[in-house]
Amino acid sequence: MTVRTRFAPSPTGFLHIGGARTALFSWAYARKHAGSFILRIEDTDVARSTPEAVQAILDGMRWLGLDWDEGPFYQMQRMDRYKVVIGKLLDEGHAYHCYCSREELDALREQQMREGKKPRYDGRWRPESGKVLPAIPADIPPVVRFKNPRAGNVVWNDLVKGEISIANEELDDLIIARADGTPTYNFCVVVDDWDMGITHVIRGDDHVNNTPRQINLLQALGATIPQYAHLSMILGDDGQKLSKRHGAVSVMQYHEDGYLPEAVLNYLARLGWSHGDDEIFTMSQFCEWFGFDHITPSAAQFNTEKLNWLNAHYIKQAELGRLAVDIAKRLADAGIQVSDRVDLQGVIALYRDRASTLNQIAGSIAYFYRRPNIEASLLEKYLTPEILPVLTALLEELKDIEWTREKLHEVIQGAVTQNALKFPKVAMPLRVMLTGSDQSPSIDAVMVLLGQEESLARMRSVLQVNV
């Protein structure tokens, strides 16, 4: 058997974290078994589906590197096929027309709720031996309902949750085509999985209740039943269902926030799955190790600190050239153009060990390419009357030296010693004048990257105002 998995999002919004994890697990299982991974866009909700959402899904998949072997297939382009299968079910007695009006169904629901019963369709239009059906009304277009078995149980061995059994008497007759002829979600999913030869359906556990209905439909069609694996939901840091209030939930928002795709993938892989104590691994390793026996059936909890830790690791490991291309774009988006005057890769190398996102690096290094606006409080704190003469003398001495870290440190240390000061008394005001902040890497390293001309110009502009 060739493994065939699928990821089937609805384009009613962005690709969210839960969907991305489902896609990752489906992709990894196909890759592990040298199978095929199919991308299917379930766009039958015409009112809510948008081209922008489709593009966001495709962008998210591509950014993560989750390549698909077939597709993307669009359900709206398969309407003729669905109608053929509906006709087959009607012809074979597995489906029937139901002429209930909305008012009838609402009244039935209200009555059942008053009687403490579970609201469900009562089968009044279901054809059965010896049953007399109501007269067909002239003014009500019918829906098509699937004739769900009345007896027995639907049993499947869920690859994550174990054996699940649902009594058929708990299931009513599912609408598979609306009054306007359009097929419904549960029906389209079944036909697609059948036609595409899906062997393993990996999806969120919010679909567990759909599974018995879909199995019954597949059996009526004489189709092979795929294996099902229902993944637990993802909770936020606070133990509540992950939502926008927990921060970014869109995959592309993580890209915008400065996360690397390999960090996001590594983190998603560990949401509900484990391989011993391994925390950091490549996607090749993940595909090799992946299996359902290591997926927990309990809810996974999102931990932003862990994601940041992983992202920091991958930033440290990434090629500087790759980071430079990305960070240059982030700076450009902020209106800051990177020039050849300052070595961007050298600047990133100076800052990446202290950053957990690319945005942090971009924000920290902006001063290399645009002179900072220095807060008055910093000037007041560090450029004190007693230190200004020292800085003025240091400016003169720095004009004619070799511009290396070693020589800069020597000259700054000389000013410290000559004036019987501690090193920070000189280094901190220098840092403020050059970077606009009292937080930065070693000041001599910053000065080398800024260059002699720019470093002296920044010192001079501050001292001219404050001396």
UniProtKB/Swiss-Prot annotation:
It catalyses: tRNA(Glu) + L-glutamate + ATP = L-glutamyl-tRNA(Glu) + AMP + diphosphate. A motif ('KMSKS' region) lies at residues 241-245. Its EC number is 6.1.1.17. PROSITE patterns: AA_TRNA_LIGASE_I. GO terms for cellular component: cytosol. One of its GO terms (molecular function) is glutamate-tRNA ligase activity. Keywords: Aminoacyl-tRNA synthetase, ATP-binding, Cytoplasm, Ligase, Nucleotide-binding, Protein biosynthesis. Catalyzes the attachment of glutamate to tRNA(Glu) in a two-step reaction: glutamate is first activated by ATP to form Glu-AMP and then transferred to the acceptor end of tRNA(Glu). Belongs to the class-I aminoacyl-tRNA synthetase family. Glutamate--tRNA ligase type 1 subfamily. This is Glutamate--tRNA ligase. It comes from Methylobacillus flagellatus (strain ATCC 51484 / DSM 6875 / VKM B-1610 / KT). The lineage of its organism: Bacteria, Pseudomonadati, Pseudomonadota, Betaproteobacteria, Nitrosomonadales.
